[in-house]
């Protein structure tokens, strides 16, 4: 039987995280075993106390503390280093800002004989769309956030297939030609970790999932987007996009990712782009810091405090 360890990472969002964990606890678990590891990633609030009180009598949830903020990558690796020594066949990385369909994991699991990495169809939670005023009340809850990932390799930009589209069945086929899956919800065979290692802590957060997927593909593992597995994402519930943190890590990590996997022509274009941006007064301080930190090889948290 498939034996799954689910990892849910929290940082100062206890109510959001509890809603997510409780949603997972209600799923159809026929055909597999599931244990949830709720990892508090150095929260400065009372998250840890709340979790321990809430789940103290629930043997299906184990609360774990990192005692410092290790980032998305380090927080997940913190528990994965331990769990890989146990008998779990698969590991589910899932955000603390999602609500899940009762059958989502069962529908992922049924595809594990063929694929080693799997992500579901992910909708925006109603009201959390990028452009909420575009949609009718009936359409909200059916607006796609992720239906697979694709890369513009010439410019090193990743995008979500179907994002902002109302689901009308246009992405209802399994897609195993995606460039990447999302760490928002990613089911991974233990064989992948055993072969390629864990998430790369150089990234700290952002693009670590794309890097992991590229390493998996280069080692002949198969991945797929699974449309009949469905969850809802409370967009920016766990980290705000567009701010300094987002600008810093995405800028630096895009260069890190591009210099690993893009063509020589694209790498040369990235160097030219970096020079232009450093000289551009309209580019933010944290974007420029991200560029500098890449070239000075300051990874993980880098200059971010």
Regions found by a protein language model. Give the residues of each.
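Acidic/His-rich active-site region of diverse nucleotide-sugar glycosyltransferases
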Residues: 74, 107-196
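Short, acidic, metal-binding catalytic loop of nucleotide-sugar glycosyltransferases
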Residues: 22-33
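Non-catalytic, C-terminal membrane-associated alpha-helical segments of glycosyltransferases
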Residues: 244-255, 259-305
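A conserved acidic beta->alpha catalytic loop
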Residues: 23, 40-49, 68, 98
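Acidic donor-binding/catalytic loop of UDP-sugar-dependent glycosyltransferases
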Residues: 46, 97-111, 119
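A short, conserved alpha-helix in the catalytic core of glycosyltransferases
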Residues: 179-230
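Short beta-strand-to-loop acidic/aromatic patch adjacent to the donor-nucleotide binding site
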Residues: 87-99
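Glycine-rich, basic loop-to-helix element that forms the pyrophosphate-binding segment
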Residues: 65-85
